[in-house]
UniProtKB/Swiss-Prot annotation:
Domain Helicase C-terminal, residue spans: 421-565
Pfam families linked to this entry: DEAD, Helicase_C
Species of origin: Oryza sativa subsp. japonica (Rice)
Comment, domains: The Q motif is unique to and characteristic of the DEAD box family of RNA helicases and controls ATP binding and hydrolysis.
Intervals of motif DEAD box: 293-296
InterPro entries named in the record: DEAD/DEAH_box_helicase_dom, DEAD_box_RNA_helicases, Helicase_ATP-bd, Helicase_C-like, P-loop_NTPase, RNA_helicase_DEAD_Q_motif
Binding site for ATP: 175-182
Keywords from the UniProt entry: ATP-binding, Helicase, Hydrolase, Nucleotide-binding, RNA-binding
Protein name (Swiss-Prot/TrEMBL): DEAD-box ATP-dependent RNA helicase 47A
MF (Gene Ontology): ATP binding; ATP hydrolysis activity; RNA binding; RNA helicase activity
SMART domains in UniProt: DEXDc, HELICc
Top-level taxon of the source organism: Eukaryota
Length: 573
């Protein structure tokens, strides 16, 4: 069967549905069609084709709830070019744009005031130099608990963050590793929930039950560290009010603890929190606080689905639909979102703007609206050395994460002599608590064996150990039973050993960011610390490159006769 030339304008065979329209014609035999061909609409044929829609309606951008974003982009482009130019194809066909009834609804009037009005940012810079927690307005019961734990003066980042979070602002907390970021968000949260909160008139009538704060961490070690911090502040009688939901632990016991203890704070890893939430065992719709610790790691692709569920369910009123016309802005306003990390690359800034409501960036002695931060665009061409490229931003983030009171050195050694150099380094610096980093798990045991053979107490820590074994190793290391902890990249984040006075890189870190994370294990809370990198002669150029990127003096040295000898070296650019 063929279509004649005279019939092509009036009799066009169309396969139409609510999703697409396929047009066949102009002397095309059916037998030659193995699959339908999609061709452009002819001007004369367009007027004769009627769109067939099913009951569910057409698949449009409006039905996907992304129409507003497209319109915004079009308006932005029109502003740059001086006006919206009609499409040449649309003008040729005399097409009129179809207005969706979905878009005709007054969205702004439906939004609650809390989602529309911006919060007033009040900054009392005198609090940046606060000498006590009383000056920050914490409740008396909480201050008493802090005094019993020996915590009397806030750090710089705590002085800046506590008042901002107490004013109900969404915040991004950025400070170097070991500066006290965990307490910077825990203290204002515990001022609002739990037995240590400040008394209010609603206490007698408030029957809120369930989880009120969810803290997400990328690793089990960091999650358990946060749990211990909360338990320490709550005290032995109320530590049941915090529950860990980390991967690797027994899930059924975690679910039983949720049912029995009814915790107000949940701390866990994305996968386990999402898993228990999907099973209906964790209810977070009435949650008031969502904290994402080490958020730059939580933005990784492997956390995407779990983080999507957490962001959709935590602090969202039960009974609302995912396609509610109020949109994500209203849902964000139902909770207070706090993002925390030692590094704040451009990806974190974009995430904060998307997940939070008028967030502010909190640094030591500094609080600024996040909207004032310029987000660099990806560079397609070769970037200039002085350009504001994303790679330069990442390097700057690594610089910001380094504790300020560190000394950096590097020495050269043959691969087979690295362990002996490690031992001589520890003796020369008289270090008592040492963390040695390697890139792989397999050689850890060999390094521990060689150190033990020379009379130096050492142990290993890696991901293949079970949860109980890891906890035991960390406890013994913190208690001083082991002098050296040999580990891999697993512990570069979240490992909190305040007494650590020396970090040694037995293997070179992969980049300057990983160097900064490793170095952050020492020099915590203002203490002094030392970082030594042991490399081969052929690897010294990598150290010089990281020195340039981090803008810190990594000095060449050697260890002879039980002493540290520092060499002078001109910078090699």
């Amino acid at each position: 069967m063929r279509l004649t030339v005279g019939q092509v304008h009036r009799h066009v065979l169309a396969l139409a549905s609510s999703r697409s329209c396929f047009v066949l014609g102009d002397h095309l035999p059916f037998r030659m069609l193995s699959l339908p061909r999609v061709v452009r609409f002819h001007q004369t044929a367009w007027h004769d084709i009627q769109t067939v829609e099913d009951k569910s309606g057409p698949l449009t951008l409006a039905s996907l709830e992304v129409q507003n974003k497209v319109e915004y982009v079009k308006k932005e482009r029109a502003t740059r070019t001086g006006g919206i130019k009609p499409s040449s194809r649309a003008s040729a066909l005399n097409m009129k744009p179809k207005v969706s009834s979905f878009n005709a609804k007054p969205v702004k009037s439906a939004l609650p005031k809390s989602a529309v009005l911006k919060k007033t940012l009040k900054i009392d810079e005198s609090l940046f130099s606060a000498k006590s927690f009383e000056e920050l307005g914490l409740p008396p019961l909480l201050i008493d608990r802090l005094n019993k734990e020996g915590l009397t003066a806030p750090t710089e980042v705590q002085s800046a963050a506590i008042p901002i979070i107490s004013q109900k602002h969404d915040a991004v907390i950025q400070s170097y590793t070991g500066s006290g970021k965990t307490l910077a968000y825990l203290l204002p949260i515990l001022s609002e929930i739990g037995p240590l909160k400040r008394p209010t008139e609603q206490d007698s009538s408030d029957k809120r039950s369930g989880v009120e704060a969810v803290i997400v961490a990328p690793s089990r070690e960091l999650g358990m560290q946060i749990v211990r911090e909360v338990e320490k502040i709550l005290g032995p009688n109320d530590k049941r009010l915090v529950q860990q939901l980390v991967g690797g632990a027994n899930r059924s016991r975690q679910e039983e603890a949720l049912k029995k203890n009814k915790p107000i704070i949940v701390v866990g890893t994305p996968g386990r929190i999402s898993e228990i939430s999907a099973a209906g065992k964790l209810h977070t719709h009435s949650c008031r606080f969502l904290v994402l610790d080490e958020v730059d790691q939580l933005l990784s692709f492997n956390y995407r689905e779990d983080m999507h569920r957490i962001l959709e369910h935590v602090g969202r009123k039960s009974g609302t639909s995912s396609r509610d016309i109020l949109g994500p802005l209203a849902r964000r306003s139902e909770r207070q979102t706090i993002l925390v990390s030692a590094t704040i690359p451009f990806s974190v800034i974009r995430a904060a703007r998307s997940w939070g409501h008028d967030p502010v960036l909190v640094r030591a002695m500094s609080v600024v609206p996040l909207e004032s931060i310029t987000v660099p665009r990806p560079v397609l061409s070769q970037p200039d050395a002085n350009s504001n490229s994303p790679s330069n931003s990442v390097n700057q983030a690594a610089v910001d994460s380094l504790p300020p009171s560190l000394e950096h050195y590097y020495c050269t050694s043959k691969a087979q002599h690295k362990v002996d150099t490690l031992r001589r380094c520890i003796h020369a610096l008289e270090a008592q608590t040492v963390i040695a980093f390697m890139n792989n798990t397999k050689p850890l045991k060999d390094v521990v064996f060689k150190l033990e053979a020379r009379g130096m107490k050492a142990t290993e820590l890696h991901g293949d150990l079970g949860k109980l074994a890891r906890s035991t190793v960390l406890k013994k290391f913190k208690d001083g039973e082991f002098r050296v902890l040999v580990t891999n990249e697993l512990s570069a984040r979240g490992l909190d050993v305040p007494e650590c006075d020396l970090v040694i890189n037995l293997d070179l870190p992969t980049d300057s960011t990983h160097y900064a994370h490793r170095a952050g294990r020492t020099g915590r809370l203002g203490r002094k610390g030392t970082v030594v990198t042991i490399c081969e002669e052929t690897e010294t150029f990598v150290v010089r490159k990281m020195r340039k990127q981090l803008a810190v003096p990594i000095k060449p040295c050697e260890f002879t006769e039980g002493k540290l000898l520092v060499h002078k070296e001109e910078d090699v650019e």
